[in-house]
């Protein structure tokens, strides 16, 4: 879950909570975001304290961060997301199979939550729309900045004053 936009960027499902499952979700997030110097916050589950998870984070330039034991408020955004998933998807119907449940969750995340579900903390915009407006304003800001010019002494490019 991207803290800035509330967008689900990496997720995986299975009948267990093995480290491999967590690594699968992490790989999805890395592929989507190509992060550098970001923080991955989680609880202190054994999957997140595993050597394999820590190693993959280091390889990707991600700094692991973990909350204190037994404190749901330490990762309130993730807790809120899962409560919303339960309320809006899982508690509304009985699934005939795990495959049906997986498809419902996939459709909810990729077809509803990320592109359309509005969040008060995002000015009542969806995660996708919030990110779009962020990138648009960055592009506008770049247009307003003066062009980069070579520094006459070092040959390096610096921002013109």
Where are the model-predicted features located?
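Charged DNA-binding/catalytic regions of mobile-element recombinases
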Residues: 1-161
């Amino acid at each position: 879950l991207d803290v800035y936009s509330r967008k689900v960027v990496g997720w995986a499902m299975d009948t267990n909570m093995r480290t491999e499952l967590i690594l699968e979700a992490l790989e999805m997030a890395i592929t989507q975001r190509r992060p550098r110097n970001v923080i991955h916050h989680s609880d202190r589950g054994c999957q997140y304290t595993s050597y394999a998870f820590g190693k993959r984070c280091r390889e990707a330039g991600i700094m692991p961060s973990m909350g204190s034991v037994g404190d749901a408020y330490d990762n309130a955004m993730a807790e809120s997301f899962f409560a919303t998933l339960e309320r809006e998807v899982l508690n509304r119907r009985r699934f005939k199979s795990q495959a049906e449940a997986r498809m419902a969750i996939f459709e909810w995340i990729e077809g509803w939550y990320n592109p359309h579900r509005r969040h008060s903390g995002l000015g009542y915009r969806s995660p996708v729309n919030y990110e779009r407006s962020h990138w648009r304003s960055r592009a506008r800001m770049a247009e307003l900045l003066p062009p980069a010019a070579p520094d006459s002494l070092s040959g390096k490019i610096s921002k013109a004053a």
